């Protein structure tokens, strides 16, 4: 029995499409394409102007979550700490981070796109961006941030 080559190619192509499942619909897996990211205002614990997008999990609940933050040029967060490890990947721009209870831009490390940084629990640090910057944070919730100086906390200013 002879099968024409065009018929065989068409059958293989149809079979390949029939058994291909996009990663974002596969049970137990999560995929987010850049065009599907939904940006909104960042949590109130951050100064106004930043935007956030939750890629995985829920920052308000216990468990792993992944969050993207987009900061405008000139944005900064006063010295603060977190209750658990934060794993930061710089997606675009330059993320400047310094360690200590007093912000000193001269002592900051400037991390370009593609950089990786881990912030340990309770470690006082400050961040600033001279250009628009996007970072990705992977950590465990509930997400917490405690300012070294409570007067720096934007949540206090809104009350």
Locate each region found by the language model:
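Double-stranded beta-helix
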Residues: 28-32, 106-109, 126-159
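C-terminal segment of classical bacterial N-terminal signal peptides
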Residues: 14-21
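Short beta-strand His + acidic residue motifs that chelate non-heme Fe in jelly-roll/DSBH
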Residues: 77-79, 97-98, 119, 124-130
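Conserved short histidine dyad/triad with adjacent acidic residue
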Residues: 62-82, 110-112, 120-121
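Short acidic-glycine-tyrosine-enriched beta hairpin
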Residues: 95, 101-122
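Bacterial N-terminal signal peptides that target proteins for export
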Residues: 1-9
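A short, N-terminal "cap"/entry segment at the start of jelly-roll beta-barrel domains
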Residues: 21-65, 152-159
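Glycine- and acidic-residue-biased ligand/ion/polar-headgroup-sensing regions
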Residues: 72-75, 81-102
């Amino acid at each position: 029995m002879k099968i024409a080559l065009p018929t065989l190619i068409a059958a293989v192509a149809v079979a390949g499409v029939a058994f291909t499942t996009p990663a974002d619909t596969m049970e137990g897996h999560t995929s987010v394409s850049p065009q599907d990211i939904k940006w909104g205002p960042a949590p109130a614990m951050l100064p106004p102007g930043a935007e956030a997008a939750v890629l995985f999990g829920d920052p308000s609940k216990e468990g792993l979550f992944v969050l993207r933050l987009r900061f405008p040029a000139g944005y900064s967060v006063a010295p603060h700490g977190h209750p658990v490890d934060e794993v930061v990947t710089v997606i675009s721009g330059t993320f400047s981070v310094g360690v200590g209870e007093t912000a000193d831009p001269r002592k900051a490390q400037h991390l370009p796109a593609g950089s990786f940084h881990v912030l340990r629990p309770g470690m006082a640090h400050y961040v600033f961006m001279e250009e628009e910057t996007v970072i990705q944070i992977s950590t465990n919730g509930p997400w917490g941030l405690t300012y070294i100086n409570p007067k720096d906390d934007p949540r206090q200013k809104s009350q």
